UniProtKB/Swiss-Prot annotation:
UniProt source species: Pseudomonas putida (strain GB-1)
Domain annotation YcgL: ranges: 3-87
Name of this protein: YcgL domain-containing protein PputGB1_4120
Ranges annotated as spanning the membrane: none
Signal peptide: none
Gene3D superfamilies for this protein: YcgL domain
Length: 97
């Protein structure tokens, strides 16, 4: 079950992406989601299949969401993941003396 999908980047939130079936475009995305997501910016198109690996998403869940609701929203990683990679000096810069 291969799917051709378009992936859109959020202008409001770094690393937030919206997956939709290319044939449907944005028509199945709920109107209430777009104010939160912002005006979708097309990033690229991709052929998805159960065998394909995605960097941060479970391909089975993505395909299931595309079939059932017409879109899949990839949330950005938790802020804790960003903080883990900062040098100790930067983490303590604003600490009171």
């Amino acid at each position: 079950m291969k799917r051709i999908c378009s992936i859109y980047k959020s202008p409001r939130k770094n690393e937030m992406y919206l997956y939709v079936l290319k044939a449907d475009g944005l028509e199945r995305v709920p109107e209430g989601l777009l104010p939160f997501f912002g005006t979708p910016m097309h990033a690229f198109d991709l052929v998805l299949s159960p065998e394909r690996k995605l960097a941060r998403e479970d391909i089975t869940k993505v395909l299931e969401n595309l079939d059932n609701q017409g879109y899949h929203l990839q949330m950005p990683p938790a802020e804790d993941e960003y903080i883990e990679h900062l040098p100790e000096e930067l983490l303590r810069r604003n600490d009171p003396v």
